[in-house]
A protein has these predicted regions:
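Conserved Rossmann-fold NAD(P)-dependent oxidoreductase catalytic core, especially the SDR/UDP-sugar
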Residues: 1-33, 37-39, 43-49
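Short, hinge-like loop/turn segments at secondary-structure boundaries
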Residues: 27-29, 61-65, 123, 148-151
Length: 200
């Protein structure tokens, strides 16, 4: 980036993408962020959890699962803390205006299990769904087999490990620093994304 014209860079990473991460995906994200932070261009690394926005794949997948009468998930007790895509955009804009430097976590206002997230989404759609948990070890075995069978498998062990996480953080300091409080509530977020039915 030396000699470039950019005055500020905002790099969106993943919660847990730290130097100490053992997961390959998180580790590579951490390395990329560190490279930008060490460059001559002012950089803000923003680590976010599951992001939900109108018309995106994560929101489509959540709605699809909520409409099912039965869901099978690997460790549905894992904690999510969804963040609205519009709040990510606001954070990026605020960071650029302030030319903020450094790495920051920003998560949504409400932590809940993946099971509860699907059930709440189903309830907002006027539906009921049952979520059956599967052992994560089974998923790791299956994804390992897929890695051996396909050059570009649909899911890898590293991807599954990223999904098997627990987000339950207080990032109000980041909100205050960027002056983007309050964040969009989970219910308001779900209302926004459920009004968009198109497949991304």
């Amino acid at each position: 980036l030396q000699g470039g014209s950019a005055a500020h860079i905002s790099y969106v990473s993943i919660v847990g993408a730290l130097e100490t991460a053992t997961n390959r995906c998180l580790k590579s994200k951490s390395i990329a962020g560190d490279m930008l932070l060490k460059s001559t261009t002012k950089t803000m690394v923003l680590r976010v959890p599951m992001v939900l926005g109108e018309g995106d794949y994560a929101s489509y997948a959540l709605r699809r699962n909520a409409l099912k009468s039965l869901n099978f998930l690997f460790r549905p007790s894992s904690m999510d803390q969804p963040l609205y895509a519009g709040d990510v955009v606001r954070a990026i804009k605020a960071g650029a205006v302030k030319e903020l430097e450094g790495a920051y976590d920003l998560v949504g206002p409400e932590p809940l299990s993946r099971r509860d997230l699907i059930k709440r989404t189903a309830s907002m759609l006027g539906r009921r769904t049952k979520v059956v948990g599967l052992p994560i070890a089974l998923g790791l075995i299956l994804s390992g087999l897929l890695e051996k069978l396909f050059s570009n498998p649909p899911v890898t062990r590293s991807m599954l490990e990223v999904l098997d996480h627990d987000d339950n953080m207080d990032t109000s300091h980041t909100e205050e620093l960027l002056k983007i409080s309050p964040l969009v509530s989970l219910d308001a977020m779900l209302e926004k994304i459920l009004n968009t039915h198109e497949r991304p």
